UniProtKB/Swiss-Prot annotation:
It is an enzyme of class 6 (ligase). One of its GO terms (cellular component) is cytosol. Keywords: ATP-binding, Cytoplasm, Ligase, Nucleotide-binding, Purine biosynthesis. It is found in: Cytoplasm. Pfam families: AIRS, AIRS_C. This is Phosphoribosylformylglycinamidine cyclo-ligase. The lineage of its organism: Bacteria, Bacillati, Cyanobacteriota, Cyanophyceae, Synechococcales. NCBIfam families: purM (TIGR00878).
Length: 341
């Protein structure tokens, strides 16, 4: 008996690395030291920092993976994976430097996971970070046929004096919401339950979606905010805080960027939720509170600025081709999310 008979195909692993090598190297920045295949990835800290702070984050894509696997469409999941990590570290004011991935599967299918890496490469290019390395684990008996899981890890850098940590936020600051591209990568256990309870398949094309399948609609990749937010930070607009709207929606995530003695007040109707959220609420009979506490509702990222810079910030995002709205205000409080109907 050998390792292959036990379910681990070393040759498939070599084929996979061969397939992705050129793509991975296309993401390399000048600071990358060496190629792929070593025991560790090496990255030189960029020059020009007086007191550099490294910022790290890790995340996954959750059960959105189930949709990709059902549709046999894997090229966008990698974008989601990068987005979930780099958008998180972006909230500190950090520039993403490099990314690493962990892929695990029951049987390594080189073409399938190469498609996942294609998305990871695209996400890295959108965020300007290098795909420095990764791990692919073949675990027979652990995952079903065609199943895999994915996790990502991002590291960024910010000048210590420019680090956003809540201390810059002031009472009266306004919250500017930047549009999401769709559901992003949170709430998919509920999405899947709604689809299943209505007896639909992911390949179904419903009239209201103009010929797109349900799978295509819900596999829309998470928007990566790195380039517009990095441009905003360099524009002269004084950003006081930022939040990435992920699991738990606005109520869970907005308070995370506040300082001591502060709460955030958000006004209903101050932005227009994307049609997909109204559709989910209707087809799943999900009440407004559950929708607010589960999904981003069309808000993927929020920046806090002074009232004096409100219009300049809105104009900036408009110039970037992004829809933005003032949705709330920082008030005195104990870290609460206050919803105004």
């Amino acid at each position: 008996m050998d390792y292959r008979q036990a379910g681990v195909d070393v040759e498939a692993g070599r084929e996979f690395v061969s397939r992705i090598r050129q793509q991975v190297e296309s993401t390399f920045r000048p600071e990358v030291m060496g190629g792929i295949g070593g025991f560790a990835g090496l990255f030189e800290i960029p020059a020009g920092y007086k007191a550099p702070v490294l910022v790290s984050g890790t995340d996954g894509v959750g059960t959105k993976l189930k949709i990709a696997q059902a549709m046999d469409q894997h090229h966008t999941i990698g974008i989601d994976l990068v987005a979930m990590c780099v958008n998180d570290i972006l909230t500190t004011g950090a520039e993403p430097l490099y990314f690493l991935d962990y892929l695990a599967t029951g049987k390594l299918e080189p073409a399938q996971l190469a498609d996942v890496v294609t998305g990871i490469v695209e996400g890295c290019k959108q965020s300007g970070c290098a795909l420095l390395g990764g791990e692919t684990a073949e675990m027979p008996g652990f995952y079903g046929a065609g199943e895999y899981d994915a996790a990502g890890f991002a590291v960024g850098i910010v000048e210590k004096s420019q680090l956003l940590n809540g201390s810059q936020v002031n009472i009266g600051d306004v919250a500017i919401a930047v549009e999401s591209s769709g559901v992003h990568s949170n709430g998919f256990s509920l999405v899947r339950k709604i689809i299943e309870s209505n007896g639909w398949q992911w390949s179904d094309c419903l009239p209201e979606w103009g010929g797109q399948s349900l799978g295509e609609i819900f596999l829309e990749p998470t928007r990566i905010y790195v380039k517009p937010i990095q441009a905003l930070l360099k524009s002269g607009i004084n950003i006081h805080g930022m939040a990435h709207i992920t699991g738990g929606g606005l109520p869970e995530n907005l308070p995370r960027c506040l300082g001591q003695g502060q709460s955030i007040q958000v006004k209903a109707g101050s932005w227009q939720p994307l049609p997909v959220f109204n559709w989910l609420a209707d087809k799943g009979q999900v009440n407004s509170t559950a929708m607010l506490e589960t999904f981003n509702l069309g808000v993927g990222f929020v920046v806090l600025v002074s009232p004096e810079q409100r219009q300049t910030t809105l104009d900036f995002f408009s110039g970037q081709g992004l829809v933005a709205n003032q949705i709330g205000t920082v008030i005195e409080g104990d870290g609460a999310f206050v919803w105004l109907d």
